């Protein structure tokens, strides 16, 4: 990372752009090398001017979420102490990575029931969430009440939305016979991001919201940057822009 920072630094000098977080998404519960790399990220986040390292909670792959909690407590207890010493916060992305509660893949931190277990096992405030509505919507979870409840543990936010096709749910169900959810660029999905900002403001959120692209089924390839630029302007307006809304 120090070598990489020397490449990044000239690109940022004289620019208003800052690094909101650095991320290493891994399974530190089962992979010792990945755990060491995550420690390296914690130790070097300060080089990039950020105190947020984003990651996964790990898992015992193929096993239920609750089976991983003792190992999570062991590994992330140590990582939390390291982060506290460095003034760093770990933000666990709320992405299932195609796993389920009964058969997790590389991240148990995708569901609020798991968050309760994780934060009970390791209460340190050095561990929180990297949150977005899309990963909750694909679980048929209403994201806004969830954000209201968990806002004080949200340390970083991805600007990514989803569209739920309820007609497909009614026709095919949710066990994979047909796709019922699509990731969308903010401004094209089901979420009114004014509501997201209202919750963040009311709960005193201090942090960043970054557009996550390369998922939208329409705004991809040659349309990718058009979609991301639209998302940026849309989110700035939802945040409280001064121009009249075109939407």
Question: Where are the regions a protein language model picked out?
Answer:
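Active-site acidic/histidine proton-transfer and metal-coordination neighborhood
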Residues: 5-6, 11-14, 18, 28-128, ...
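Conserved beta-strand positions in the central sheet of alpha/beta enzyme cores
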Residues: 21, 54, 91, 155-158, ...
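Residue-level signal for short, function-critical loop segments
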Residues: 25, 59, 133
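A short, structure-level motif marking secondary-structure boundaries and short turns
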Residues: 25-28, 63-65, 180-183, 217
């Amino acid at each position: 990372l120090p070598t990489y920072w020397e490449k990044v630094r000239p690109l940022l000098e004289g620019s208003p752009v800052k690094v909101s977080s650095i991320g290493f998404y891994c399974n530190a519960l089962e992979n010792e090398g990945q755990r060491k790399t995550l420690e390296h990220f914690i130790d070097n986040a300060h080089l990039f001017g950020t105190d947020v390292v984003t990651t996964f909670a790990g898992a015992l792959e193929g096993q239920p979420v609750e089976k991983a909690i003792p190992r999570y407590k062991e590994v992330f207890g140590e990582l939390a102490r390291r982060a506290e010493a460095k003034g760093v916060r770990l933000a666990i992305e709320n992405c299932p990575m195609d796993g389920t509660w009964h058969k997790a893949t590389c991240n148990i931190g995708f569901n609020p029931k798991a968050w309760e277990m994780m934060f009970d096992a390791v209460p340190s405030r050095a561990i929180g969430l990297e949150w977005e509505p899309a990963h909750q919507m694909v679980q048929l979870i209403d994201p806004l009440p969830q954000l209201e409840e968990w806002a004080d543990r949200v340390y970083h936010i991805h600007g990514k939305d989803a569209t739920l096709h309820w007609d497909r749910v009614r026709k095919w169900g949710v066990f994979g016979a047909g796709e019922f959810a699509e990731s969308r660029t903010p401004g094209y999905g089901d979420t009114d991001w004014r509501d997201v900002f209202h919750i963040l403001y009311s709960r005193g959120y201090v942090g960043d919201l970054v557009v996550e692209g390369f998922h939208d089924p329409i705004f991809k390839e040659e349309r990718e940057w058009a979609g991301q630029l639209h998302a940026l302007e849309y989110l700035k307006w939802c945040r409280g822009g001064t121009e009249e809304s075109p939407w």
